């Protein structure tokens, strides 16, 4: 065995062995317990970054550990390959998005292989291939047939430079997040999937997800936003009644105005007759629309000239247009109670509208409505027949009053909106719908799928090539001329079901092969960043339930356990090209080897926490592997070891063996239960320290050292698999470490012959005492009293009491 650690050679040999033996190729095996470990697949941007390396290192460690436990482990990899960056790169580099994407995939695949990740590459998929997206198109047509898909006109944030629709969160200070252009509001027909039909199930099933971080579940609960309230009508003379939704019907008697969104039909009608209203609406359309911004932005409004009638009191209530009311939430109209809602309060103060208190604190505490709204619950006042009721009692009483008169009804509302899946981009999955000349919409027939995206295109940066080419859209439906939909799917569609396709990626007769899918699913461990807590993880859960209800999967949830790894930081900030603080994984691998990079990634922080990149830490990881290598080389050089005779061990041998099995016990818990790989590595480092100090002068001592080194190699094999491969062979094993079992704890090795006790006199430590582990209290007491330092501090005193706490301490009370 070469005494020098040469990572480039060692890693090439291990990877060659895995390739030759197809070590990570798996098939269904009913006789074995399965474990499906999945890390979120990357966008093929061109190069891996350290965030990828961390994510995939964690997944690989979990996968290799579970394999050593004897499980049938699936760990696949693929590419989330559609999306805007490919279009931008195509324009910049004058190359078709498909060519750019596949070149990036080839390069990044090589990087992943160089890191030694144990993927079943036979299952590799790229979402931009027709073999993949044809099934997404097929599934969409099935959802359409089931009534879960519809098209409607929808107001969108339109980026005039990028020529695309932006999500609310992509509008920053009224400008497109990427182009910086002023965003416009535009109405276009868009396709939606009815995620709201599943809102209750998506909410309730979060309670089943015991293996998910509480933070992620809370974020999803808030996003779904279930609320119970009342929907009621404010009549308007000569107009349709204005319908509003409120979660606080107890405050209804305090309404002093109603407010509608700029896009509300009443607002549009008012704008047609009043240019000031029209100008205000235009201004609203160019301000921030992300919900989070609503709380902090300046409240602005304009009076429409219309007056509504309060449904209970009959009083006149002015109708305003307000920039804080969103058309996308509720009915696009709100009843405003300035005394009991801070946003309504700020608006009322600005425009001199009445602030009518109708709730007082139940404890009678005074409130100052000149300063702020009182938003708590309490007892009703100034509310006619409802005076004296608590807020909870008034909720039902007012709801019933309205219901009896057909003026309102109780209603459950959701913050969640149906999923708009249309994108006006080229590089995405074509939406498989056609429109015949009579305006009827039809799903593309199955025998015409996939609707393939042309890949040999030139990008002009303005119009999608499939929109620019009128010939592409021309097709027939039942022999009649028809036009294809030229929008493409939101790329969250592809990532919402890829985990299921990995179970049978080669299937060309079905979206999912039932036997394979129901063997592997659900995913046992999913790993990815918390930035995906809402959209990707919610859409995947939704898609899974759609797959279940179409008979394609038989479980309710896609991911049993979720681990959200922390970011990789440098100089205290997230690595980014703009900050100039990135570290190229490729450079690190070439300098130190993949195992060192993996070891550093797993040692520097627990997986859920942010990791601070530290060159000295990488150097330290490299030194540790070299040290382990040298220890094994020296041990092998010392000659063959015989069989370990545990009964013939001296105290030093027993101590090393105890340390070995304590380490196995701790590391097994760190890997299996806690996911704290950093403390697992620290424990193995401690064991290696003990091994290096151990004097193996006899055959039996060499044998106990062999056991310790074997344990260290096995415990680190999931983290440094290449070095583990060579070291395991060097230690005399014919089987590869990839096929070795996880070491088991010998409980008898943990039993101590003697234990150390602290001896206190009057509560102060005066001695430490080694006693036989099985010594009785009387013996311990006698040994403690014989300690010279104890004698010194009890001399001339009367010993009143001796307290023996077994296995811990002796406390002598003397005065």
Swiss-Prot record:
GO biological process: leucyl-tRNA aminoacylation
Keyword Aminoacyl-tRNA synthetase: yes
Residues that bind ATP: 577
Residue ranges annotated as motif 'KMSKS' region: 574-578
Enzyme class label: ligase
Gene3D superfamilies hit by this protein: 3.10.20.590, HUPs, Isoleucyl-tRNA Synthetase, Domain 1
Superkingdom in the source lineage: Bacteria
EC number: 6.1.1.4
GO terms of molecular function: aminoacyl-tRNA deacylase activity; ATP binding; leucine-tRNA ligase activity
Sequence intervals crossing the membrane: none
Compartments in which it is found: Cytoplasm
Annotated GO CC locations: cytosol
UniProt KW keywords: Aminoacyl-tRNA synthetase, ATP-binding, Cytoplasm, Ligase, Nucleotide-binding, Protein biosynthesis
Motif 'HIGH' region, residue numbers: 42-52
Reactions it catalyzes: tRNA(Leu) + L-leucine + ATP = L-leucyl-tRNA(Leu) + AMP + diphosphate
Family: Belongs to the class-I aminoacyl-tRNA synthetase family.
PANTHER family (alphabetical): LEUCINE--TRNA LIGASE, MITOCHONDRIAL, LEUCYL-TRNA SYNTHETASE
Protein name in the entry: Leucine--tRNA ligase
Lineage: Bacteria, Pseudomonadati, Pseudomonadota, Gammaproteobacteria, Oceanospirillales
């Amino acid at each position: 065995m070469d005494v020098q650690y040469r990572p480039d050679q060692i890693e090439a040999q291990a990877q060659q062995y895995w390739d030759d033996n197809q070590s990570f190729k798996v098939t269904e095996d009913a006789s074995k317990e399965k474990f499906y470990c999945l890390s979120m697949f990357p966008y093929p941007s061109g190069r891996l970054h350290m965030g990828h390396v961390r994510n995939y290192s964690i997944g690989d460690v979990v996968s290799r550990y579970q394999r050593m436990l004897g499980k049938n482990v699936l760990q696949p990899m693929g590419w989330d390959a559609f999306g805007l960056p490919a279009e931008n790169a195509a324009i910049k580099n004058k190359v078709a998005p498909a060519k750019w994407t596949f070149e990036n995939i080839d390069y990044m695949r090589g990087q992943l292989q160089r890191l030694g990740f144990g993927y079943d590459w036979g299952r590799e998929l790229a979402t931009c291939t027709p073999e993949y997206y044809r099934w997404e198109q097929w599934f969409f047509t099935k959802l359409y047939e089931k009534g879960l898909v519809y098209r409607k006109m929808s107001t969108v944030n339109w980026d005039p430079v990028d020529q695309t629709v932006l999500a609310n969160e992509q509008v920053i200070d009224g400008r497109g997040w990427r182009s910086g252009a002023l965003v416009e509001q535009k109405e276009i027909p868009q396709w939606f999937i009815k995620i709201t039909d599943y809102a209750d199930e998506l909410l309730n099933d979060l309670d089943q997800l015991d293996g998910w971080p509480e933070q992620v579940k809370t974020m999803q609960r808030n996003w779904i936003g279930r609320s119970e309230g009342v929907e009621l009508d404010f009549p308007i003379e000569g107009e349709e009644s204005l319908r509003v939704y409120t979660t606080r019907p107890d405050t209804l008697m305090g309404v002093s105005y109603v407010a509608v969104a700029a896009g509300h039909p009443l607002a549009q009608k008012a704008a047609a007759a009043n240019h000031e209203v029209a100008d205000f609406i235009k201004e609203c359309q160019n301000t921030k629309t992300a919900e989070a911004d609503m709380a902090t932005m300046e409240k602005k409004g304009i009076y429409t000239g219309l007056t509504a009638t309060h449904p209970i009191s009959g009083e006149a209530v002015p109708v305003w247009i307000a920039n804080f009311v969103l058309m996308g939430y509720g009915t696009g109209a709100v009843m405003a109670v300035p005394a009991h809602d801070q946003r309504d309060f700020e608006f009322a103060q600005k425009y001199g509208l009445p602030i009518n208190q109708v709730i007082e604190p139940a404890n009678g505490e005074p409130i100052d409505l000149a300063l702020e709204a009182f938003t708590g619950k309490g007892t009703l006042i100034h509310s006619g027949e409802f005076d004296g009721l608590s807020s909870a009692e008034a909720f039902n009483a007012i709801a019933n009053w309205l219901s009896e008169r057909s003026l309102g009804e109780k209603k459950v509302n959701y913050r969640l909106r149906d999923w708009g899946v249309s994108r006006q981009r080229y590089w995405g999955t074509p939406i498989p719908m056609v429109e015949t000349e009579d305006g009827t919409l039809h799903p593309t027939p199955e025998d015409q799928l996939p609707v393939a995206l042309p890949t040999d295109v030139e990008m002009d940066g303005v119009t999608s090539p499939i929109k620019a080419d009128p010939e592409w859209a021309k097709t027939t439906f039942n022999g009649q001329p028809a036009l294809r939909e030229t929008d493409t799917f939101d790329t969250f569609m592809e990532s919402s079901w890829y985990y299921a396709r990995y179970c049978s990626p080669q299937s060309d007769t079905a979206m999912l092969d039932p036997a394979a899918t129901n063997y592997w699913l659900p995913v046992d461990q999913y790993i990815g960043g918390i930035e995906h807590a809402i959209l990707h993880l919610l859409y995947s859960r939704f898609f899974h339930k759609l797959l279940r209800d179409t008979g394609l999967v038989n479980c309710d949830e896609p991911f049993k356990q979720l681990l959200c790894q922390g970011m990789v930081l440098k100089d205290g900030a997230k690595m980014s090209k703009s900050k100039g603080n990135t570290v190229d994984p490729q450079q690190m691998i070439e300098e130190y080897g993949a195992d060192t990079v993996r070891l550093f990634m797993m040692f520097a922080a627990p997986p859920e926490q942010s990791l601070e990149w530290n060159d000295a830490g990488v150097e330290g990881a490299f030194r540790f592997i070299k040290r382990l290598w040298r220890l094994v080389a020296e041990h092998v050089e010392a000659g063959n070891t015989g069989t370990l005779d545990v009964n013939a061990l001296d105290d030093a041998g027993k101590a090393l063996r105890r340390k070995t099995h304590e380490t196995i016990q701790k590391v097994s818990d760190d890997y299996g239960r806690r996911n704290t790989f950093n403390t697992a590595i620290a424990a193995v480092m401690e064991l290696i320290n003990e091994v290096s100090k151990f004097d193996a002068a006899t055959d039996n001592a060499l044998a106990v050292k062999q056991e310790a080194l074997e344990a260290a190699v096995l415990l680190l094999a999931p983290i440094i698999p290449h070095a583990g491969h060579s070291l395991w062979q060097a230690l005399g094993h014919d089987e590869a470490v990839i096929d070795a079992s996880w070491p088991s704890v010998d409980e008898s090795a943990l039993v101590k012959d003697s234990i150390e006790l602290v001896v206190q006199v009057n509560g102060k430590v005066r001695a430490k005492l080694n006693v036989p582990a099985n010594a009785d209290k009387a013996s311990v007491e006698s040994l403690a009293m014989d300690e010279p330092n104890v004698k010194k501090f009890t001399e001339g005193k009367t010993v009143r009491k001796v307290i023996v706490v077994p296995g811990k301490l002796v406390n002598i009370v003397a005065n």
